[in-house]
């Protein structure tokens, strides 16, 4: 059985979030939670929340055991980019892009489904 969770519009750039997601790809849930807890970044905190929600979905909806769950698939897609302006000296204006991400994590209790 498989359960997933999607967090859309996370306030973290996709490039920075992918570095943390690569650490836990294909690992079991307990190991992944330990790795994310010891990684001190905003992206790891958001990924940890999405992982905990995916595990809760698997336990509640499918009746799976938390100890058997493995991260079968996880990816980050770019979200909406907010464009903000910042005023500088001598009537100069610079544009700053605030990038967002869509974080998707799928957990499975079958080891064969995990890639």
Which residue ranges define each predicted feature?
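A short, conserved strand-capping beta-turn/loop at the end of a beta strand
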Residues: 76-88
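C-terminal structural segments of small proteins and small subunits
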Residues: 85, 91-102
């Amino acid at each position: 059985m498989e359960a997933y969770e999607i967090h859309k519009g996370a306030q973290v750039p996709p490039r920075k979030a992918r570095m943390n997601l690569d650490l836990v790809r294909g690992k079991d849930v307990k190991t992944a939670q330990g790795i994310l807890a010891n990684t001190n970044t905003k992206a790891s905190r958001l990924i940890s929340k999405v992982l905990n929600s995916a595990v809760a979905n698997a336990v509640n909806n499918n009746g799976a055991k938390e100890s058997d769950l493995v991260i079968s698939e996880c990816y980050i897609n770019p979200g909406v980019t907010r464009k903000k302006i910042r005023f500088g000296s001598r009537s100069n204006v610079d544009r700053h892009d605030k990038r967002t991400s869509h974080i998707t994590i799928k957990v499975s209790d079958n080891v064969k489904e995990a890639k």
